[in-house]
Amino acid sequence: MTDEKNPSYLNLNKLTKAGSVLNTPPTFSIYVLKLVTEWMVKSGGLEYFEEKSKRQSNVLYDFIDNNSSQVNCKVEKTYRSNSNVVFNFTNEADNENFIKLSTEKGIIGVNGHRSVGGIRVSLFNSVDDEMFEYFLDFFKQFLVENK
């Protein structure tokens, strides 16, 4: 493996020139990658996670679109992410209240990017259906209580 595109620790030319002491590969990161990959394969593979991602994001976007008097997503439907759903409340004070209350309910990291604010819900692979439903129930209740 002498291709310059390979990481240094897999590039035999670089390793030979450095007397095999070029650097230590990030062994813990590689090990965690192995564990995550095994978990994903065991859970159903890429097809399963793609389907779950699309299903969860579609449910959340539909909910947002159907409650446009209180919440809106400014991203055009064509460009919406399946991983990070971003939106704002029409009442700006609700953004901070939502973040505060969600944290109290154990839902963390929903604050939007520091440059744009709002809310960002990450639907990464580790977010299973039970977690998603917990969040969605919280979101529905929040809208009812903040009409």
Protein language model regions, located:
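Active-site C-terminal subdomain of aminotransferase-like
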Residues: 1-61, 76, 147
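Short, flexible, solvent-exposed loop/turn segments with mixed acidic/basic and small polar residues
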Residues: 39, 73-78, 110-113
